[in-house]
Amino acid sequence: KGNKMSKSTGNVLDASDLLDKYPVDLVRFYFMWKSSPIETLNFSTKELMSRPYQILSTLFHIHLYFKQNSEYDKFNINEKTVDWAKDNDMLSSADIWLLSKLQKTIELCTKLNNECKFHESASAIEDFLINSLSQIYIPITKQELWNDDETKKNRRHVIYAIIAESLKTLDVLIHPFSPFTSEYLYTTIFGDKKSILLESWPKSTPALVNESIEESFDIMNEIVSVCAAARMKGK
């Protein structure tokens, strides 16, 4: 519910104190994620350290996951791209599903930013990062990445290409909200340019959108969620 900030009630937050205690990018992202142009904002440091922190932490750890595994596998990020995988007909259903989700996220974030609906844009980034990339794609491809069979190397490189494309796009999409974090992650992992500010804004590729595979995956994920909930209830 919240109360109005007032000096007399002693609930005013000093910006310098807030930024001494919490990362500036986390505070920035929280405000953009939380703020609606038509609603008052109930500020909570507890909420700040919950979902917004999880979003930035997940983004960081997937970059780390990609870096550790791709370097071990000697993956060349400039040679093995999504186009390479697509042209050689090496995309699995999971790859196609994630790429399709990514194109829609690009379109949605671009539209919402142009309409100054930044809180909805931040939520769209959250949805793709957490619900699609982190909770579905990474888990279902993990065993393939950890298969050291040399004959499966191309498959592993396809997965790296998909993750790299997703992360690079997310870095640019989230940059207006969390510039220091995205700059660090981009230059550490990709470094195509001296700064992420020199990157172009992502554009969706309609040819990568696949409605039928998206629908099939969404149904499958719903079934898995229901089964998991039933299993937890039965314990």
Predicted segments with their positions:
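Acidic, turn-prone loop/beta-hairpin segments
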Residues: 73-107, 139-234
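Short runs of predominantly hydrophobic/aromatic residues within well-ordered alpha helices
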Residues: 15, 27, 52, 56, ...
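Core structural elements
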Residues: 32, 53-67, 92-105, 122-145, ...
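Generic beta-strand/beta-sheet core signal
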Residues: 1-3, 7-8, 30-32, 44, ...
